[in-house]
Amino acid sequence: MRPSELTQLKQDGRAISILTAWDGISAALVEAAGADVVLVGDSLAMVALCHATTLPVTVEQMLHHTKAVGRGFTRPLPQQPLVVCDLPFLSYQCGEDKAVAAAGSLLKHSCAAAVKLEGAEPEVLAVIERLVRMGIPVMGHLGLTPQAVHQLGYRRQAEDPRSQAQMLQQAKQLEQAGCFALVVEHVPSSIARCLSQQLTIPVIGIGAGEDCDGQVRVTADLLGLTPSQPPFSQPLIQGRQLCVEALQGWVKQLHQQAKTATTTTSPPEPDC
């Protein structure tokens, strides 16, 4: 899967599926599920590294996990999902050169074929244009942007006409800057539908209604592996509970075997 193929999927009216992965096991599961895109999201800071936000994760950690994702795939390269890696907090907000170095490292040394950036500030748009000129595909991200949690929080975005008009303008700027797709998170379905209709590039929703060109979800949320999930990403199974019950069964069985062994007559010790 290549970035340009996602636009063709939009034109064909076929929904685009994006799931996150953070190691080899999760990558193998997502690949087997048939997802179009694997996102190595900075959400791994919370899912895999137990941080409270996405902010602490570094470029080096993103590279480490993206390499693991690549090793988890089992299909030949042409049949593998497109891998998009998040550029973490402060890896692209501090200048174009730093952003190029971070994105270039991810594409050179891992299976990533594209990067994702949050926001549409003038500085971010300049970074996107620079990356695209250098041959690095970029996915945009508007709405609830976790890297701006201390400024915006985790609340729903673009709920009034003024902010919706601003989001539409930003989305068009991201498309003009060269983004091949756009994620919109935790926004009203009406604005997501408007973006999908007015943009040529695919609009991928998460908590943005069903009228987008595709959907993205955190795999651990869908599997019920996280302690809690956002309202727009309810689990399909109670994976955490199932795993705990399976492991408890193993521990219980082992303890019972040990108890049985201590109550039976032990054979005489061999002479050494």
Swiss-Prot record:
Pathway: Cofactor biosynthesis; (R)-pantothenate biosynthesis; (R)-pantoate from 3-methyl-2-oxobutanoate: step 1/2. Its main location: cytoplasm. 3-methyl-2-oxobutanoate binds at residues 42-43, 86, 116. It catalyses: 3-methyl-2-oxobutanoate + (6R)-5,10-methylene-5,6,7,8-tetrahydrofolate + H2O = 2-dehydropantoate + (6S)-5,6,7,8-tetrahydrofolate. Its EC number is 2.1.2.11. The active site is at residue 185. One of its GO terms (biological process) is pantothenate biosynthetic process. Its cofactor is Mg(2+). InterPro entries: Pantoate_hydroxy_MeTrfase, Pyrv/PenolPyrv_kinase-like_dom, Pyrv_kinase-like_dom_sf. Binds 1 Mg(2+) ion per subunit. Mg(2+) binds at residues 42, 86, 118. The keyword Oxidoreductase does not apply. SUPFAM superfamilies: Phosphoenolpyruvate/pyruvate domain. It is an enzyme of class 2 (transferase). Keywords: Cytoplasm, Magnesium, Metal-binding, Pantothenate biosynthesis, Transferase. The keyword Magnesium applies. GO terms for cellular component: cytoplasm. It is found in: Cytoplasm. HAMAP family: PanB (MF_00156). Catalyzes the reversible reaction in which hydroxymethyl group from 5,10-methylenetetrahydrofolate is transferred onto alpha-ketoisovalerate to form ketopantoate. Homodecamer; pentamer of dimers. Belongs to the PanB family. This is 3-methyl-2-oxobutanoate hydroxymethyltransferase. The lineage of its organism: Bacteria, Bacillati, Cyanobacteriota, Cyanophyceae, Synechococcales. The gene is panB.
